[in-house]
């Protein structure tokens, strides 16, 4: 864990080194000041030596200024180092997340990743700054104060040892108890973020089902759980202050009583007693700071472990040593492909799939929910790796390609598409950042998106709200199809992406595909047989097994599942879901 986190500090080694240096300088200056005060009282005030008071007073001001300068510089470099550390952590996590395959992403919840990128990183930032400053300042101050106290009067300094031992034991108990509660807080932050995310992203569904009160209660409960944990933790930490005060005041009373007796006896001066009392406060404050450091470190350890889970998670899909940088054509072959999401699972999602698809063919993929239609096409762009067998694109195993090269040649349009905040032009150019306005319009004509875009007052400069909330489901799907076409892919996958489009528009889109992109291999996943019956060939999937593969006419003649569903759909009484489960 330390090695993983330490890699994010390298850029700020100088700041991380200078911070404790200035902290040590500040502590040394603060340690000298009580001695100078004692000298002013004993050799200046009581002796009536004004010159000595002026000289020592001037020196004390200089030392205080040096201490102030050192503290300021320590704070500056500490803030720079901790903020830079946090920045690098966020960047490293975000960049690593971008490399994740779908199977890596499945290990984390979205809310959990957000919490790690925000709350957990902030905890580590605060802990690192505290580590550079307080973790240096507190023990050095404690040691210096103890040394000076024994130097002044070893007998009175023994009072410190008793106080330090008592306070140290109590603070250790408090720290351990608080750490237990803080360890339970962070998973509850995930629950809170998940509640917010689900509610905001599905606000229309919430309102449609009048579930606002339920969502409020769910959020309130998640927030209350965090509150309860923090109350317990802070309740334990609240003992810090009263315990500190009791020990400090007891120590001061003991020092004052013993010191007064020693002053009367002539074995201690007034200035020395004042110095001892000042060092007493320094020692107790150092212990207090150390206790807070331990609590913060206890919190940050939990955060550090969660962050390292993300940083140490390596994508199980990587480029080969000598990748292929060119896809010859859009041909696709499934060679005895078996696939499992969980490698330890006994039952495969896809079982011994054998298919050979020529470049430029239009392939329909039909099956009920749970028949693994999406899983099949996800293997083409290597979003997952096969468990057994091989998937070939352009005659080569997809595992031999450079990932960017392969995925640049495969465009996928999902049923639940995502549009980003920005103009229509900006969204379209996700497919090709260098696309001209005319190329964008041409892609929209193929996707039949120009029909509604031209009706917008701002046309292609119309601003799309976050998530595409100001366009309908069908409009969103057509914009996403246009975006995919701008990639000019060798393989186009439409994963039930015309489900929100009317039948007439669906037919227009299919006709445009046949005429305008005949060399592109097209996979059309659909529930409606009418959407794929004109395809060159159709794959019938049933529970992860290829039940049939052929033309519409061939399947009607030879495949019972296809024929039954076709007849039920043409009579308006059924679909593939009668044959399957979840996709």
Region locations from a protein language model:
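Hydrophobic/aromatic residues in alpha-helical transmembrane segments
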Residues: 33, 37, 74, 78, ...
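Hydrophobic alpha-helical transmembrane bundles that constitute the permease/transmembrane domains
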Residues: 20, 24-32, 65-72, 124-127, ...
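An intracellular "coupling" helix at the cytosolic face of ABC transporter transmembrane type-1 domains
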Residues: 10-13, 99-103, 119-132, 136, ...
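Membrane-integrated ABC transporters
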Residues: 1-30, 37, 45-59, 66, ...
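Helix-loop-helix
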Residues: 49-53, 144, 148-162, 232-305, ...
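Short intracellular "coupling" helices and adjacent cytoplasmic loop segments at the cytosolic face
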Residues: 47, 83, 91-115, 119-121, ...
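ABC-type nucleotide-binding domain
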Residues: 325-583
């Amino acid at each position: 864990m330390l090695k993983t986190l330490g890699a994010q500090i390298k850029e700020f080694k100088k700041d991380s080194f200078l911070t404790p240096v200035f902290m040590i300088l500040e502590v040394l200056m603060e340690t000298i000041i009580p001695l100078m005060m004692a000298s002013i009282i004993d050799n200046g005030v009581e002796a009536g030596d004004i010159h000595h008071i002026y000289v020592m007073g001037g020196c004390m001001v200089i030392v205080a200024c040096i201490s102030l300068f050192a503290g300021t510089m320590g704070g500056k470099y500490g803030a720079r180092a901790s903020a830079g550390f946090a920045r690098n952590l966020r960047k490293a996590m975000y960049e690593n997340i971008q490399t994740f395959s779908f199977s890596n992403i499945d290990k984390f919840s979205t809310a959990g990743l957000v919490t790690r990128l925000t709350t957990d990183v902030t905890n580590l930032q605060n802990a690192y700054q505290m580590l550079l400053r307080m973790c240096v300042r507190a023990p050095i101050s404690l040691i210096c104060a103890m040394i000076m106290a024994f130097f002044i009067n070893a007998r009175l300094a023994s009072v410190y040892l008793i106080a330090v031992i008592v306070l140290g034991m109590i603070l250790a108990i408090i720290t351990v108890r608080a750490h237990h509660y803080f360890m339970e807080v962070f998973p509850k932050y995930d629950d809170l973020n998940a509640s917010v995310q689900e509610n905001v992203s599905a606000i229309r569904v919430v309102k449609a089902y009048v579930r606002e009160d339920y969502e409020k209660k769910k959020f309130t409960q998640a927030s209350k759980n965090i509150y309860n944990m923090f109350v317990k933790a802070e309740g334990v930490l609240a003992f810090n202050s009263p315990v500190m005060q009791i020990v400090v005041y007891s120590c001061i009373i003991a020092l004052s009583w013993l010191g007064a007796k020693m002053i009367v006896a002539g074995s201690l001066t007034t200035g020395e007693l004042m110095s001892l009392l000042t060092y007493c406060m320094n020692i107790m404050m150092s212990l207090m700071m150390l206790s807070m450091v331990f609590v913060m470190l206890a919190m940050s350890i939990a955060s550090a472990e969660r962050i390292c889970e993300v940083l140490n998670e390596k994508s199980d899909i990587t480029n080969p040593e000598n990748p292929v940088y060119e896809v010859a054509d859009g041909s696709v072959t499934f060679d005895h492909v078996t696939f499992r999401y969980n490698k330890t699972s006994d039952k495969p999602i896809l079982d011994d799939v054998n298919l050979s698809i020529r470049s430029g063919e239009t392939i329909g993929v039909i099956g009920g929910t749970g028949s693994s239609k999406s899983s099949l096409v996800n293997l083409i762009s290597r979003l997952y790796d096969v468990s057994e067998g091989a998937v070939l694109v352009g005659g080569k195993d997809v595992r031999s390609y450079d990932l960017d090269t392969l995925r640049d040649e495969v465009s996928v349009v999902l049923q639940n598409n995502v549009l980003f905040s920005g103009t229509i032009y900006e969204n379209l150019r996700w497919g090709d950042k260098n696309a001209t306005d005319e190329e964008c319009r041409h892609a929209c004509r193929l996707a039949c998106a120009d029909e509604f875009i031209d009706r917008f007052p701002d046309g292609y400069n119309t601003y799309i709200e976050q998530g595409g909330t100001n366009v309908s489901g069908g409009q969103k799907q057509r914009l996403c199809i246009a975006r995919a076409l701008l990639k000019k892919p060798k393989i186009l996958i439409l994963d039930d992406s015309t489900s929100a489009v009317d039948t007439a528009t669906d037919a227009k889109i299919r006709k445009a595909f046949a005429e305008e992109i005949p060399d592109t291999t097209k996979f059309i996943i659909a529930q409606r047989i009418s959407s794929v019956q004109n395809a060159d060939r159709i794959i019938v999937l049933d529970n992860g097994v290829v039940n049939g593969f052929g033309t519409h006419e061939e399947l009607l003649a030879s495949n019972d599942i296809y024929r039954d569903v076709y007849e039920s759909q043409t009579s308006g009484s059924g679909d593939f879901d009668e044959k399957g489960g979840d996709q």
